[in-house]
């Protein structure tokens, strides 16, 4: 039995309106069930609880509540089939979630519902082919890869004392130092027995290079300036004076990896590699993927800023704002649960009411939706498509890189689980391909 009839379809500037007449039999049955639910605990003098005759109970019902509950029940029943109607499913501009719902007719005999589905706005994207200051996508260089390998070796290195020499680049200086600004000690720039690798650029310009040549027991004063872009607002560009004493000099003694010892350097999840060459092949793939991801993320921040500053949409669909703001709130509640902090306490610590947080989320949601709509529009213009082959290839690549030694059965299960999140994987690939295309235009 068809639960409803699609009576009329009207496309407006911002919405697609569907007029839906609920099947008469379904409407009657739904009212009967809701009547039973509402009267099962009803109390009337002379009858036991729940034993009031239906014909008598109906006279005591709130008719508006009965119709409201019945309407919600049929909406819940028909909504998913309604989303599969060709007029919605075949139109990629229709936003399926959170339609506005109204009633053309609602009484004991008839129920005609109006569903207003938001439409994706039509607009021209900003000039995405000439965004300044984007970084090109560059393959992993040998020196970058060797540095990552060396970092693995360094983790197994041993510190040895070399205090009988003058401090040089790459040495580890053990220092006591006091920083003063305007003649007053700055606690955040003061420490004892601090281990500083010379050349690491961990401190402000001139500090590390100013220590080179010192010997243990030497004292030195450095007059420097905090950089103009220093993170502490009150210290930006200010002169600072450091009194420093060198207490010890250390070096990291490193044994290079080779075929006989490489497994000693690898964590448990990589012990399945049978040769150093085999590990290096895998590790190169891993480091390359991470470098690409960092490049895409850094560029994505700049692309987003450009789009938000240069995009004017005719409107932003309320349904998308609600969808995104709800997602943000769920993520915030999940984070509180992860840290085992009551959500209300987290709000109190942030000095925000729930209403204030939701308003902030709505503002962020508007920006997120705007960015997503522009990226989708560019993907359409550039005819960027993601088919099942690309989705399967992406899933296989993720499993191969993240889980190199899972057995075939577990790999099959992981593939199946990720395939259940097909829409999410598709959105990631589409975003990556679109970001890559924008970078290529702007860096060539």
From Swiss-Prot:
Residue ranges annotated for the PPIase FKBP-type domain, each copy included: 170-255
Keyword check for Nucleotide-binding: no
EC number: 5.2.1.8
Keyword annotations from UniProtKB, A to Z: Cell cycle, Cell division, Chaperone, Cytoplasm, Isomerase, Rotamase
Primary location recorded for the protein, binned into one broad class: cytoplasm
GO molecular function, one term: peptidyl-prolyl cis-trans isomerase activity
Enzyme class: isomerase
Xref: PROSITE patterns: FKBP_PPIASE (PS50059)
Catalytic activity: [protein]-peptidylproline (omega=180) = [protein]-peptidylproline (omega=0)
Pfam families hit by this protein: FKBP_C (PF00254), Trigger_C (PF05698), Trigger_N (PF05697)
GO CC list: cytoplasm
Location relative to the cell: Cytoplasm
GO biological process entries: cell division; protein folding; protein transport
Domain commentary: Consists of 3 domains; the N-terminus binds the ribosome, the middle domain has PPIase activity, while the C-terminus has intrinsic chaperone activity on its own.
Described purpose of this protein according to its UniProt entry: Involved in protein export. Acts as a chaperone by maintaining the newly synthesized protein in an open conformation. Functions as a peptidyl-prolyl cis-trans isomerase.
Matches recorded under HAMAP family: Trigger_factor_Tig
Family, as annotated: Belongs to the FKBP-type PPIase family. Tig subfamily.
Protein name: Trigger factor
Gene: tig
